[in-house]
From Swiss-Prot:
Listed Gene3D superfamilies: Acetylglutamate kinase-like
Taxonomic lineage from the root: Bacteria, Bacillati, Actinomycetota, Actinomycetes, Frankiales
Family: Belongs to the UMP kinase family.
One Gene Ontology MF term: UMP kinase activity
Keyword Secreted: no
Organism: Frankia alni (strain DSM 45986 / CECT 9034 / ACN14a)
Annotated catalysed reactions: UMP + ATP = UDP + ADP
PANTHER family for the chain: URIDYLATE KINASE, URIDYLATE KINASE PUMPKIN, CHLOROPLASTIC
GO biological process, one term: UDP biosynthetic process
Function per UniProt: Catalyzes the reversible phosphorylation of UMP to UDP.
UniProtKB keywords: ATP-binding, Cytoplasm, Kinase, Nucleotide-binding, Pyrimidine biosynthesis, Transferase
Enzyme Commission (EC) number: 2.7.4.22
Notes on how activity is controlled: Inhibited by UTP.
Name of this chain's protein: Uridylate kinase
Length: 256
């Protein structure tokens, strides 16, 4: 039996790019689609907030010599491209109850995001793919992922990372002795200065107490395991580690 009834998956554009920094990777896309299908088949309702960093990043506006707001608009349209690509792959794999909803109207290819309609679609078994963030510039898709989770009554946010299996006490790519946290509280993340997601998104999650699961999307079955209540990656919630201290991961994963 699933632990969660409804989740929001935060999917970065980099996950779609696979081993490349930009563009698309067909193997990565198929892996993502099959992971989503597995979660749906477990009975969990799924909404997906898709990023666009594999196509364009608004924070690179200076590099291109364009206005930041214009750059963010381009980035939002990049999330539409990724959402349509994901929908196309899911359809090719046999999924037929799919909706792409956008915060910026693109009526020729998707429907506008309307909260109550999105909730209704989830209740009817649709996988809802959410594009364009929340339609506002100066934000990554971290904030809309938490925002949509709260709006849609999701039980948790699953932040899928590509090649990173949780939150560490230091950068594991630089420090081979870096240790991964199994559990953290919101306050522990702040006091330790750990980088989990954009601060505005993290504060929103903390204020409303929605659990965050930071995990490696490349690990097959990780999303489904999390939804069943098995531990993967790092869990951030109101309690954190036992006895008020952050819990470091052990060699064996445990049920949470």
């Amino acid at each position: 039996m699933a632990k969660y009834r409804r989740v929001v998956v935060k999917l970065s554009g980099r996950a779609i790019a696979g081993s490349a920094e930009f563009g698309f990777d067909s193997n990565a896309l198929e892996h993502l689609a099959r992971e989503i299908i597995a979660v749906r088949q477990s009975g969990v309702e799924v909404a997906i907030v898709v990023g666009g960093g594999n196509l364009f990043r608004g924070n690179q506006s200076d590099r291109w010599g364009i206005d930041r707001v214009e750059a963010d608009n381009i980035g939002m349209l990049g999330t539409v491209i990724n959402s349509l690509l994901l929908r196309g792959k899911l359809t090719a794999l046999g999924e037929d109850n799919l909706r792409v909803m956008t915060a910026v109207p693109v009526p020729a290819v998707a429907e506008p995001y309307i909260r109550l309609r999105a909730v209704h679609l989830l209740e009817k078994g649709a996988t809802v793919i959410l594009a364009c963030g929340n339609g506002q510039p100066f934000l990554t898709t971290d904030y809309p992922a938490v925002q949509r989770a709260l709006e849609l009554g999701a039980d948790a946010v699953l932040a899928a990372k590509d090649g990173v299996d949780g939150v560490y006490d230091s950068d594991p790519k630089i420090n081979p002795e870096a240790q991964r946290f199994s559990r953290l509280s919101y306050d522990e993340v702040i006091s330790r200065g750990l980088r989990v997601m954009d601060q505005s998104a993290f504060i929103l999650a903390r204020d409303f107490g929605i659990p965050l699961h930071i995990f490696d999307i490349e690990q097959q079955g990780a999303m489904t395991a999390i939804c069943r209540g098995e531990h993967r990656g790092t869990v951030i919630d109101t309690t954190g580690g036992k006895a008020g201290s952050a819990a470091l991961a052990s060699s064996a994963e445990t049920v949470v």
